[in-house]
């Protein structure tokens, strides 16, 4: 896994470096904020699940600004693309502690059902490292925004990230042994998609689609504040460490995804 991470980061770096040779200006920034992780823990579209399974993320971001040239400190030719698009690169990390909430583990069910107790006692976490790019579209002029302190620049984006995930699954039920059948809710004991059980502590990697909506605020001529609401869909259902057999349990067949509300600061290097 470390070799794969190094290879992806190097490829990512040199691709940006090659693009940078065209003279576009650069921006760097830091983002952070809460991450609501939607997984096989809890009940989907349930408020307690959404609120309870919320973690935290932090990231470094880099932008290529096509409207300005760093090599001559001048504007690029005025085209629609140059004045309305930026290319964002990102290296980020998020971690979320996970547990079961919702209608299957209400106090009434916990008082009467051992299965409900087993489900509630199953907990976990996942840590995800992202590296990827997004193309941001600004409906208003980037040039006008750059020249006007106190202005706003709303945007939407779409891109792809490569993700390295490290889940942890454990139980507090009985003697706390995860591989003891009597300690685990039955549906997680069934083999699933090449694994012996519907849970796994194996690290892995996968692609994801990333889309966001947000805005910038021009703080100074060389700095912006940013707020960004992002949706990220993983091409795997093992990111959280749980994946009950999707054929037998179709309610759990959806892949994992998250929503990240991040706030950040951006500085113009050129």
Regions found by a protein language model. Give the residues of each.
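Residues that define the transmembrane beta-barrel architecture of outer-membrane proteins
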Residues: 24, 50-56, 83, 127-131, ...
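Residues on the lipid-exposed face of transmembrane beta-strands in outer-membrane beta-barrel proteins
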Residues: 30, 34, 58-64, 70, ...
């Amino acid at each position: 896994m470390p070799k794969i991470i190094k290879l992806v980061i190097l490829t990512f770096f040199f691709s940006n470096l090659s693009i940078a040779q065209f003279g576009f200006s650069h921006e760097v920034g830091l983002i952070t904020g809460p991450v609501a992780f939607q997984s096989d823990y809890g009940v989907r579209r349930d408020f307690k699940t959404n609120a309870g399974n919320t973690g935290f993320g932090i990231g470094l971001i880099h932008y290529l600004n096509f409207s300005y040239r760093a090599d001559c400190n001048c504007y690029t030719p005025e085209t629609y693309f140059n004045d309305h698009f930026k290319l964002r690169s990102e290296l980020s990390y998020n971690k979320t502690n996970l547990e079961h909430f919702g209608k299957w583990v209400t106090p009434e069910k916990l008082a009467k059902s051992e299965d409900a107790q087993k489900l509630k006692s199953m907990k976990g976490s996942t840590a995800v490292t992202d590296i990827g790019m997004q193309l941001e579209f600004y409906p208003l002029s980037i040039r006008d925004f750059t020249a006007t302190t106190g202005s706003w620049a709303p945007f939407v984006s779409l891109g792809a990230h490569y993700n390295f995930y490290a889940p942890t699954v454990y139980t507090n039920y009985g003697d706390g042994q995860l591989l003891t059948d009597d300690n685990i809710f039955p549906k997680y004991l069934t083999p699933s998609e090449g694994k012996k059980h519907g849970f796994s502590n194996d690290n892995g990697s996968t692609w994801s689609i990333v889309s966001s909506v947000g805005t910038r605020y021009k703080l100074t001529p060389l700095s912006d504040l940013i707020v960004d609401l992002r949706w990220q869909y993983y091409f795997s259902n093992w990111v959280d460490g749980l994946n009950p057999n999707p054929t037998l349990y179709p309610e759990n067949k959806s892949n994992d995804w998250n929503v990240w509300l991040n706030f950040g600061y951006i500085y113009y290097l050129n």
